[in-house]
């Protein structure tokens, strides 16, 4: 891989444009747009994050014994985002209750949204790229602002501001978990008709945690909060299709949910060591995958070489050691007396084609499990195909969005880790390979990674800095596109 120089950022606010031609970065109260092929600056804006008049009035009237904070951090950008066509971009300051919008083609054009008395928790683009969703404080409402008409549409009482909502894959419908008169309901809104309410129907949940719409757009999965391990499948018409609750209830609810890219399966796991897989025909469990403390010889087991970073001085790459025979996996024993024990499924993610499911368990923080799933024409026998054992806890792992068998992970050090099944031997046979790649930078511990939409580049982020990584040979293709 080729690595770029290190650049500043704040709050991990770095994002590729949907076409992967630009990189948007927030540095305190400034926005910077760079070309992704040369990293040269093409646009910069100094964002006005000063509170709105309403926010200032409320702040001046608020009576509190605590001293007011005048820290400049309170005026920093907290959210950024690209419109779907990369023409517009937003920068929000939740503390100030303002959202600023800019045009990549016209540096002089700008728009500003003042959240008002209800405050601002989160702002993001709608799929149409011309509407912005603003979530208020205290779960009061969601406001959809249209850049085309300049009007606002209000939806009252969302259950959560950071979850519990989704768009259908085609962007036509907006689904939102709401609470009215102490009852939880699901709202379906038509985005093509100014977010007009299509229907409301009651939810079977007592305290909904979140929801996820299937890739086909026909079903929505809704699950309970930490008091109960229960998941429901509903149609967008409001019909309850199925429900699932293991017996006995392992407690603390569901942590991770992931739809198969085709919508054929739904994978989810809680605070125990099990992953349940439901199929979309009967909505019944077809397989339960469990964390294995001892992995058999039939599984490819890869271990990070000891001391490789010091031996290579953080430059170049080195293959993982492939272990022979069955191996024990380092698994910690969680403290179940604590409110949030370090246990259970912390991440589930399917690859592009749905032939692999990546899973990470919090009580096995150094391990990545890769399960292989058959295609529609093969017999259904999912199995643990590969295990990656790292020297340090894995912070994040992400599948390549365009290639089926390409995974990248980071562990908070000056390295990234890759797994791929795309290697070809001298005999022309395909095989898998795991590698550790040093990042040639003295002050960049990779704590977060983001793929470019075209799958040819990576953003590697530390607390207040980032760099890009591109595969050797892919950069020329990127420039030609």
Give short role names for the model-derived ranges:
Residues 1-481:
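Long, low-complexity intrinsically disordered regions enriched in Ser/Thr/Pro/Gly
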């Amino acid at each position: 891989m080729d690595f770029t120089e290190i650049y500043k950022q704040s709050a991990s606010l770095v994002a590729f444009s949907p076409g992967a031609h630009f990189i948007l970065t927030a540095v305190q109260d400034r926005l910077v747009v760079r070309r992704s092929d040369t990293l040269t600056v093409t646009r910069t804006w100094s964002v006005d994050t000063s509170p709105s008049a309403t926010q200032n009035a409320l702040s001046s009237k608020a009576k509190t014994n605590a001293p007011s904070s005048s820290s400049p951090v309170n005026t920093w950008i907290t959210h950024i985002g690209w419109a779907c066509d990369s023409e517009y971009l937003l920068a929000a300051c939740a503390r100030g209750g303002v959202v600023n919008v800019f045009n990549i083609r016209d540096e002089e054009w700008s728009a500003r949204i003042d959240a008002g008395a209800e405050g601002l928790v989160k702002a993001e683009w709608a799929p149409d790229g011309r509407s912005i969703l603003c979530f208020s404080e205290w779960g009061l409402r969601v406001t959809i602002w249209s850049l085309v008409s300049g009007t606002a549409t209000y939806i009252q009482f969302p259950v959560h501001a950071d979850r519990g909502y989704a768009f259908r894959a085609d962007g036509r419908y907006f689904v939102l978990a709401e609470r009215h008169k102490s009852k939880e309901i699901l709202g379906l809104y038509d985005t093509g008709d100014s977010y007009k309410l299509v229907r409301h129907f009651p939810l079977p949940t007592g305290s909904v945690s979140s929801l996820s719409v299937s890739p086909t757009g026909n079903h929505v999965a809704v699950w309970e909060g930490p008091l109960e391990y229960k998941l429901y499948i509903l149609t967008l018409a409001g019909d309850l299709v199925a429900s699932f609750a293991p017996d006995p209830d392992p407690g603390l609810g569901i942590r991770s949910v992931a739809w198969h890219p085709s919508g054929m399966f739904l994978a989810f796991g809680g605070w125990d060591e099990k992953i349940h897989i439901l199929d979309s025909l009967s909505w019944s469990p077809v397989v339960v995958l469990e964390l294995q403390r001892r992995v058999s010889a039939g599984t490819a087991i890869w271990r990070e070489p000891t001391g490789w970073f010091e031996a290579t001085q953080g430059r170049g790459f080195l293959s993982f050691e492939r272990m022979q025979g069955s191996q024990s996996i380092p698994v910690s024993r969680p403290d179940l007396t604590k409110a949030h024990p370090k246990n259970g499924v912390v991440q589930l993610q399917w690859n592009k084609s749905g032939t692999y499911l990546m899973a990470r368990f919090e009580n096995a923080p150094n391990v990545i499990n890769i399960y292989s799933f058959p295609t529609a024409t093969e017999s259904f026998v999912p199995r643990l195909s590969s295990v990656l054992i790292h020297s340090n806890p894995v912070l994040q792992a992400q599948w390549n969005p365009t290639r089926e068998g390409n995974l990248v992970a980071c562990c908070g050090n000056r390295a990234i880790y890759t797994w791929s099944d795309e290697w070809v031997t001298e005999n022309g046979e395909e095989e898998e390979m795991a590698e550790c790649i040093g990042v040639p930078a003295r002050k960049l511990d990779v704590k977060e990674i983001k793929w470019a939409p075209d799958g040819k580049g990576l953003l590697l982020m530390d607390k207040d800095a980032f760099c890009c990584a591109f595969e050797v040979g892919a950069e020329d293709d990127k420039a030609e596109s």
